[in-house]
Amino acid sequence: MMTISKALPNFFEYAEHQTSYALRDVILPKDLSLLVKWMHQPHIIPQWQLNKPELELAVYFERMLCDDHQHLYIVQIDGKDVGYLEIYEAKRDRLALYYDAKKDDLGWHVLLSEDAVGQGHFRAVMRMLSFLIFEHSNAEKVVGEPDQTMSVYEKIRADIALEPQGTIQLQEKTAMLYHCYREKFYQQCGHYYKTFKRKKADKCLVEN
């Protein structure tokens, strides 16, 4: 039986402001060297705590790929691999111990590599992952639980329809629980996706 997360597409494309974004499935062992490199970058270590030897990470990501409550993606910007994304089913995740998770709720963990950080892409990447979820599932709510010290989410939440729900104490961190509701997200950000789809359709007409 196909689970909610595994039913998400293997590839999803998006664009904003003449920049192309995409999500593609993680492929092992092809992507292992990239994942090892990213997990050892200084800005990623404190949040992910996966700065482990390559063999340990190979086993870790194999297990992650076999876990049917989540879907692993590589984030691409203009065709370049620049980040990692996990989409997970909140009801079947430990997060369900900390809030009243609904069956269709989907959550995320995301990172951008050091060469993509600070380049003005994070809002678009966050909108892309929400469009992926809302366009290809029945989720009425997307959830996130970043470390409360990650101030970037507070800075951009108004631009991506994130609503803070308060802090929760996980084993390894104090997290800020965020909800992103489908209706509000499309009211606020839907025009981005409409613009992308229109430009894509126009391009197809020209090419044909």
Swiss-Prot record:
Pathway assigned to this chain's UniProt record: Siderophore biosynthesis
BP-aspect Gene Ontology terms: siderophore biosynthetic process
Domain of life of the source: Bacteria
Catalysis performed (reactions): N-hydroxyputrescine + acetyl-CoA = N(1)-acetyl-N(1)-hydroxyputrescine + CoA
SMART domains, sorted: AlcB
EC number: 2.3.1.316
Keywords: Acyltransferase, Transferase
A GO term, aspect molecular function: N-acyltransferase activity
Xref: Pfam families: Acetyltransf_8
Gene: fbsK
Record-given protein name: N-hydroxyputrescine acetyltransferase
InterPro entries: Acyl_CoA_acyltransferase, Acyltransferase_MbtK/IucB-like
Family: Belongs to the IucB family.
Protein's job: N-acetyltransferase involved in the biosynthesis of fimsbactin A, the major siderophore produced by A.baumannii. Catalyzes the acetylation of N-hydroxyputrescine to form N(1)-acetyl-N(1)-hydroxyputrescine (ahPutr).
